[in-house]
């Protein structure tokens, strides 16, 4: 495989201003900009962590959250195609249920499916996306943050930033973007931030619509038929209001309100003799969260948050038997508090306590309409001595449930340990080792969904080991090279899968999976001046995730479904005085649509190539930005999910204005 090795990304340079003051007299001199580099967080961390800033995503032409996460090593994004297709994230073959999402410091949950659809988030107001695998170096976090094998952290913009992701520090900031493109895309957005002495007020709103109709080729044996993808339209509204109030020099209070509404068609799987689909999905989500932090001293601090979340969704279809409609409602109340202290030099301790109350109601007949109460308690420590950094944590989980109809599960109670160790062997070389024992609680659908739910399910258990090395060096102050490599081993037991019975399917603990893999990332950046630079980035993942359930099964040892053995990405960004030019490539190797590795289930690999051109203009102290993105230059209708063809070559034009 010629395409297995690649290189990884983009570090944002830091500008430093040097000033000189004469010892006898004061003189005013011009600013001198010194080119420098910021070391990637992945290089310094004791467990794998990868990040993308707002400036990175903008210049690379990254369109949505799924597109951003595809560039991280060890990540598979399940994309159902179309402009508004659902997107979930699978880390190292564990399944989307093992991936947590934190939005501005507070966990995002979905007790019904256990998976967060990342298509509901837009990138216009995102300042940073990070992916943490295993034990986090940051122990100043909520207890629930320890409850996932991997964590996606999303931070929103508080006002806008410059091309180096630095705040512009203006009191009044206003930015608007209008996008248009293929498939009837039209998407305006508005970002506002006003800073007073102690109070900050921010607002963000966006609208997106697209008809989603695109051509694709349908093959049946030797015949190829030209078809059009229909029922892939989408109309989405998003809005946020943020208030930040500095109570004192040591205390801050933050409040956020979020609203989301989406109406979209579900195009369904492509069937040779019937490409029609009438499935529709309406999603509505509202949440509000309050955050408080008090830094009592340099050695002790406390933060707490409260959140209320309401989600409503309606699925409808018109099958041969007549109109069908299902309505689901979720409500969540969530509380968290974390105390951090430094009792000794180099030793940090934290204690976190979280509580969540979830209720799910369904319009299905004989629906259980369950309620879940969850408690998480986490004790963590971080110790640094010499060239060593050690992190450890212990999470206690206690979950109880009750239902309106039938019998509830017995609940779930478990201790989950984790640790990581980093050794700085040389000035530029670090070695790291980590272990995490975690479990996934069965979702309310898996436990109580009418007809297939199983109240006797056990948690899905995961044990993960990681051994890696990182290297970063700057040559002649103009060239920086960063490399990371992580090998890992893991196993999943009591895997929850749907098992066929005599006349129906039922969720069962009937699976075991073993994972052996390697993640490599690399970044090289050459800076000749402020106006000229070149960044080359790449990532490569090898993953052997095989079924280890029953040695007598014919598919024992086969690769699990939708998990390629080889995947990767590469990017190159050239910054010039006239414009920025970027090239991106995504590689997905061969995989299987079912856990039985036979030719009928094989899905061929593909590469997706894209380019982005962007230009900034200064007009009357205001900034205007034009950007053109062209995706899928090969015009291939490849499939990420079987029978869900992706669009061919498509384009997007963006115009942004900042006051």
Q: What annotation goes with each model-predicted range?
A:
Residues 345, 483-491, 509-594, 621-623, ...:
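Gram-negative outer-membrane beta-barrel transporters
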Residues 19-58, 66, 96:
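Short, acidic, small-residue-rich periplasmic hinge/interaction motif at the N-terminus
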Residues 488, 587-594, 602, 610-659:
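C-terminal beta-signal and adjacent terminal beta-strands/loops
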Residues 66, 70-107:
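Extracytoplasmic beta-strand/coil segments of soluble accessory domains associated
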Residues 248, 344-354, 358-359, 363-490, ...:
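Structural signature of Gram-negative outer-membrane beta-barrels, strongest in the C-terminal barrel
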Residues 210, 214, 226-236, 246-332, ...:
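Flexible loop and strand-edge segments within Gram-negative outer membrane beta-barrel domains
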Residues 303-315, 431-432, 460-516, 521-525, ...:
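Membrane-embedded beta-barrel scaffold of Gram-negative outer-membrane proteins
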Residues 120-175:
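A beta-strand signature from Gram-negative outer-membrane beta-barrel systems
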